[in-house]
A protein has these predicted regions:
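Exposed, flexible binding/inhibitory loops of compact, secreted disulfide-stabilized domains
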Residues: 57-59, 100, 126-127
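Short alpha-helix capping/helix-loop boundary micro-motifs
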Residues: 74-81
């Protein structure tokens, strides 16, 4: 039996997911409930084709940019358990969307401890660090 929820390694063990800093992945947000698996964590698996691995705090500028490039994150979509985001919400964002926003100067700040390590296959740690959110 293999796991498909992003936590398994196929042999029955469930290793704790790691973040981009190499430590245990921390929860991104429970309100709104985020993550591909809607468990608050930016973890991923084979069924997460968008790779929702970057924990961000969205801004109005980012939300406008995302809508302009065809990904409306502001409008609620209850059929996908998606509440619609507003400025200040934390959310597990697709790594390619974050990279695109960064290239256009509108990347939202990230919570490094809550970004899944697999994001580093697409973006550089230094780029994430340059946009790191200082938590209170």
């Amino acid at each position: 039996m293999s796991y498909t929820n992003g936590n398994g390694n196929g042999n029955g063990h469930k290793p704790k997911p790691k973040n981009v800093l190499g430590t245990e992945l921390k929860c991104c947000c429970l309100k709104p409930l985020t993550g591909f698996y809607r468990d608050g964590f930016c973890r991923t698996g084979a069924d997460d084709t968008g790779r929702h691995t970057v924990c961000v705090r969205v801004t109005d500028d980012f939300l406008k940019f995302s809508r302009a490039v065809g990904n409306d994150l502001s409008t609620p979509r209850p059929e996908f358990a998606f509440p619609g985001l507003v400025d200040g919400d934390k959310w597990c964002l697709c790594v390619l969307r974050w990279k695109e926003a960064n290239e256009h100067g509108v990347a939202p700040q990230v919570v490094l401890e809550s970004c899944h390590e697999s994001a580093l296959k697409i973006v550089e740690l230094e780029d994430l660090k340059e946009n790191a959110l200082e938590e209170d």
